[in-house]
């Protein structure tokens, strides 16, 4: 025992009581690393309130925040993916589908809803990137075509939020065929005189960017979204040159004329409602 311990009274050292904080209450911005309250981030549509970084948002959450609450219905929910080729790589395709369905709660990588946008009749589609990288499968193509058919039948505008790595390799040519299938459907929509607004979010790559994502009457990008066919590293290795800073980001594409607008996710609802109202010769209902 030290001389200090002899002259000082013994005191019981107490530590603050640990509070059990439920998992998932806090998260961190992937750009600025600011610690954020999860509920506040969700209210801000997964956009960091400090640096305005647009994080990825689930397809269903995006559509529910985008469309009017009243009267929206899901389209093509009964369509389910099939392992036609009995494909197997390091894992069976059937097992990959089951794991993705369990993780996301979705049957496939595209969710389609019919409803109104501030009173303007629309059909809206959104890719679920967490479902096998938002890859385009036969079901994704079929649901997109169903969305187009609903627009033509009822005179609605079409909006699609893309977030995809491209065609689904496990479905081979069945997946690649969806590029032509969705493009042909959009041609019918154009001939019907109905508008299509394509919103490219982070990331939109491969076969999706080479088909339905770039065929909008108006192509919109979210801020700093990665948009292209092949990834920047693949291009650098192919051309053996250093790419410009910000290459394949939405700001770069806007500067080069590849997209028409960049819209903050929090302004998307108002801006697209205004555009669609003009294109459909109707008016928005102010909230």
Curated annotation (Swiss-Prot):
Keywords: ATP-binding, Cytoplasm, Fatty acid biosynthesis, Fatty acid metabolism, Lipid biosynthesis, Lipid metabolism, Metal-binding, Nucleotide-binding, Transferase, Zinc, Zinc-finger. Binds 1 zinc ion per subunit. Zn(2+) binds at residues 29, 32, 48, 51. Pathway: Lipid metabolism; malonyl-CoA biosynthesis; malonyl-CoA from acetyl-CoA: step 1/1. GO terms for cellular component: acetate CoA-transferase complex. It comes from the Bacteria. The keyword Magnesium does not apply. PROSITE patterns: COA_CT_NTER (PS50980). It is found in: Cytoplasm. Its cofactor is Zn(2+). GO terms for molecular function: acetyl-CoA carboxylase activity; ATP binding; carboxyl- or carbamoyltransferase activity; zinc ion binding. GO terms for biological process: fatty acid biosynthetic process; malonyl-CoA biosynthetic process. SUPFAM superfamilies: ClpP/crotonase. This is Acetyl-coenzyme A carboxylase carboxyl transferase subunit beta. It comes from Aeromonas salmonicida (strain A449).
